[in-house]
Regions:
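Charge-rich, low-complexity N-terminal segments
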Residues: 1-25, 38
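Generic structural signal for short, solvent-exposed loop/turn connectors between secondary structure elements
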Residues: 1, 14, 59-62, 119
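Well-ordered alpha/beta subsegment
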Residues: 89-119
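N-terminal first-folded block
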Residues: 24-33
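Residues that form generic nucleotide/phosphate-binding pockets
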Residues: 9, 25, 86, 114, ...
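Exposed alpha-helical structural elements
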Residues: 5, 18-21, 79-82, 107-110
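Short, conserved beta-strand/beta-arch hydrophobic-aromatic motifs that form part
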Residues: 37-95
Length: 119
């Protein structure tokens, strides 16, 4: 499995553009890396800050489910309250991670800008 395979799982053209924006946005950041991950029926893009698995993007037919994971939240530069204020549609999981359904490139750009500002 590779990143192109993940993109093929998306049906919506807007969500494909959003996925591309996420991949491009993290590709250009120093200290960030990513890889496609396959686990049963749930395939994801794992995004690392140095060696910490801080973010994920899970393709869906109509959106990309973006995760801000606990290792990133523990850094203290992004907070659950801050993310929820910026994205009221975001949700907090039972594991204490923040998820957001990203359906378009504009939302992807806002999400990436928030992450970059917390670098």
């Amino acid at each position: 499995m590779n990143i192109a395979d993940l993109r093929k799982e998306i049906v919506s053209s807007d969500a494909k553009v959003a996925f591309d924006a996420i991949v491009d946005g993290f590709s250009g950041q120093v200290g960030m890396s990513m890889n496609a991950h396959e686990q049963g029926f749930l395939n994801s893009l794992r995004i690392y800050r140095d060696s910490d698995y801080c973010f994920a993007a899970v393709p869906n037919d109509e959106w990309v489910l973006a995760y801000i994971r606990k290792p990133e939240l523990r850094r203290g530069k992004l907070t659950v309250d801050g993310v929820m204020a910026a994205f009221p549609e975001a949700r907090l999981t039972n594991q204490g991670e923040v998820t957001l359904r990203i359906r378009d490139a504009g939302t992807a750009a806002r999400w990436l800008a928030m992450i970059r500002s917390a670098a």
